């Protein structure tokens, strides 16, 4: 099920009006604003957008009104599962701090997996808004490309809560 128009939100920029979808990496050298994806298997896709604007509250309200989006993702908080308990996470952080103090490492990335059952019609931008309100990662992003807009078999739906630049 497709939701609204194609949109890409990366950091403090919002892009709309999908112009092109390609799997040819050379196309991005020809200019424009592109959202680029690559799967773990190495499949590349790029989505070129016509309109890019700063992300602000007014543009978010306009987007919500134009797409009929809800305020949240519709995923009950209790349904989220973590690969680590809070106690295990704190222990891992303390272990890393000790290893840094000993000089054994100078940087470590502690990761955990959060998972929840998702409906096929998940409001991607609603999930992005929920993450933005509760986990303000500096490079929070979302990409929604309805299949009908891009000639694809299925929608592209990506939400990332990355603390690091892409």
Show which residues each predicted segment covers.
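Extended alpha-helical targeting/anchoring segments
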Residues: 1-166
């Amino acid at each position: 099920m497709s939701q609204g128009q194609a949109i890409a939100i990366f950091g403090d920029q919002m892009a709309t009006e999908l112009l092109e979808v390609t799997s040819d990496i050379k196309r991005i050298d020809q200019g424009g604003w592109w959202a680029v994806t690559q799967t773990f298997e190495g499949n590349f896709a790029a989505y070129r957008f016509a309109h890019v604007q700063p992300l602000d509250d007014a543009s978010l309200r306009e987007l919500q009104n134009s797409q009929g989006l809800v305020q949240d993702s519709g995923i009950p908080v209790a349904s989220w599962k973590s690969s680590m308990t809070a106690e295990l996470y704190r222990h891992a952080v303390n272990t890393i701090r000790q290893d840094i103090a000993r000089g054994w490492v100078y940087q470590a990335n502690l990761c955990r997996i959060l998972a929840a059952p998702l409906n096929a019609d998940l409001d991607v931008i609603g999930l992005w808004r929920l993450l933005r309100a509760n986990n303000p990662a500096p490079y929070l992003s979302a990409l929604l490309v309805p299949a009908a807009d891009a000639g694809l078999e299925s929608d592209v739906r990506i939400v990332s809560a990355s603390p690091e630049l892409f």
